[in-house]
């Protein structure tokens, strides 16, 4: 059973154990895209866990932490402040506004009293899921209590927040600007990467809950080799990547069957990526090498003419593209499976050359 199917099964069978942190961890999936395994929570899983009822059950445990307070007067004031109605109302606010923030704090093992106090501060200052991520491990939000969030706890929150912030790729969005520690919800397929002069292409599967494209199975992630150098070199590389992303977006707008669309242009820290559909048929050269030679017949001749006419029309459309001056097309073609035939597509186009590393 795949990890995605296992997650769905766990969600269907889930009955909270009373240990919310364990219940959340049981739904984690693993991304292997970055060379080492990184856990993330699939989109939508918190909907079944961070309910007002479950949150209140966690907040009700605050009395377990009252013994840490030095005086009986302090313990009494906390009981009077954090009434049942107060915790119920706070639970509803957390469910509607800060489920990711709450889940991250649960995984930081704050203790129930500090968890309650921290979420109260978040509500009072409107620190919610839209405030995530905190951008540095030493960047404590102004409203947070420094005694509850010493440096090591703040670092823990910074590291664990990414588990709940994996991006969702929508057909209505093209540009994605992610923080450097963002976890991609990808599983690398057992296919050797394809290395080019300025890029590496990986075959990956995007978790089903992190993509909103019709019938998108495997995708190609093209990682651009960005030169690490002085500020001007970095700036030039950024401009080059921006130009390529813009040109690919213009090509998408052509909407030609023989031109594979770029699904997404992704920044992650200093790294740059493009996402394309995976071409199942591989390159035309590989196709010829792998298919036994045979004498042409009427069907193959007609199919070849149809494909060549489609490619010629695609090239004509590219010539008329408003960004055609930025396009430097390469002579590599891809075969994309369509029903029981193959559709030849212009797949690999380099908009602008990246300097050699």
Regions found by a protein language model. Give the residues of each.
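Non-catalytic localization/regulatory regions flanking kinase domains
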Residues: 1-202, 207-218
